Amino acid sequence: MDKIIKSIAQSGAFRAYVLDSTETVALAQEKHNTLSSSTVALGRTLIANQILAANQKGDSKITVKVIGDSSFGHIISVADTKGHVKGYIQNTGVDIKKTATGEVLVGPFMGNGHFVTIIDYGTGNPYASTTPLITGEIGEDFAYYLTESEQTPSAIGLNVLLDENDKVKVAGGFMVQVLPGASEEEIARYEKRLQEMPAISHLLASKNHVDALLEAIYGDEPYKRLSEEPLSFQCDCSRERFEAALMTLPKADLQAMIDEDKGAEIVCQFCGTKYQFNESDLEALINDKA
């Protein structure tokens, strides 16, 4: 089961989140049938949103959009504070690797664009923020957003490793944040440790990558685990929701679906579930609008 572990240095100077998001990203790949680069780009976006959602309280919903002028198109993710996330990538078929090593490439092909976040607190006044893509690798772009928009200097690492068949092998990441009151000495010590950390891909390849991440972040520094919470890919689409969307269409449009297509098929962008509405269903909607 996927999870996020929240922890804090005993000194109170820093906190860290570490995530195992393997099942989340594997299910996203399965639902969208993504190729290698698209899988990694979508997976990193989902993990970033899982981190962002874990930072919120109440029943907030968080939307993350990675919008670039690239082969990937837009990447959209929506998460809640209960550990659920969903998402999709416009172009599922991007498959770009280094010839020599087989490394999956994302950043060099993301192009120019923006990292957009929308936090809906349920009050009718969502908070939106837009920051430019810095590298297109998504992790660095997320860290830049946290520093610029939330004024919280953060170290971010997130990645998706694929097997020889380009299926998700492991996915996860971490966030480390300085807390108010940290001394210059403590900040310098943690900056040095983060600079010396192995690459996120190396840590994820460890047998128990969650413990490996915590060990790399804290070293010999004493820390406390605050909580361990489940994570999952979960879409909240339903037939009723799409039926309500059809009800917003003019009668003439519904009648055209009956006359021309003998019904309608609606596919959820976030999970690929197909909903069929036959002629009788559409006629009932027309009658309900009368």
Swiss-Prot record:
Localization, UniProt: Cytoplasm
GO molecular function, one term: protein folding chaperone
Disulfide topology: C235-C237, C268-C271
GO terms under biological process: protein refolding
InterPro entries with a match to the protein in the record: Heat_shock_Hsp33, Heat_shock_Hsp33_C, Heat_shock_Hsp33_N
Keyword annotations from UniProtKB, A to Z: Chaperone, Cytoplasm, Disulfide bond, Redox-active center, Zinc
PTM comment text: Under oxidizing conditions two disulfide bonds are formed involving the reactive cysteines. Under reducing conditions zinc is bound to the reactive cysteines and the protein is inactive.
Gene Ontology CC, one term: cytoplasm
One Pfam family cited in the UniProt record for this chain: HSP33
Gene3D superfamilies in the cross-refs: Hsp33 domain (3.55.30.10), HSP33 redox switch-like (3.90.1280.10)
PANTHER family linked: 33 KDA CHAPERONIN
Annotated family: Belongs to the HSP33 family.
This protein's name: 33 kDa chaperonin
Organism: Streptococcus pyogenes serotype M4 (strain MGAS10750)
